[in-house]
Amino acid sequence: MKESNNYWYVYIILCDDNCYYTGITNNLINRFTKHKNGKGANYTRSHKPLKFLSAWEVDSVNTALSIEHYIKSVNKKIKVLFAENNRLLKQYYVRDIKNKGKRDCNSISVRSVSKKKLNSINTLLNN
């Protein structure tokens, strides 16, 4: 399964203690493998990653970083909503940045990675 490195991904991973980890990458498979092997973020060294719950494709690292920061700022109840229905992220994120008057929301491109693709990636990673 080849991924395009022209895009960045924001993702939520379920960890073994039922907590969520949010991060960014330009390659979902390689990044998860690093997390799983203890070479990713410090957080996933002590909270073992199990699978991707949600992921979104964006056009730039700056957008990815901004969305990652936003997801990390919301409570777990909202993160659960994003994990269950990944199409909600863009709606919530755009509303948040509009309220803060930060940037032009019309230029933001956030595409949900399908549950089918995530399931395929999770299956591949667990074999």
Residue spans for each PLM region:
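Residues at or immediately preceding the N-termini of alpha-helices
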Residues: 28-29, 60-63, 76
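Residue-level detector of flexible, active-site-proximal loop/helix-junction positions
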Residues: 39, 59
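Short arginine-rich
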Residues: 42, 69-83
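Arginine/glycine-rich "motif VI" loop of SF2 helicases in the C-terminal RecA-like domain
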Residues: 42-48
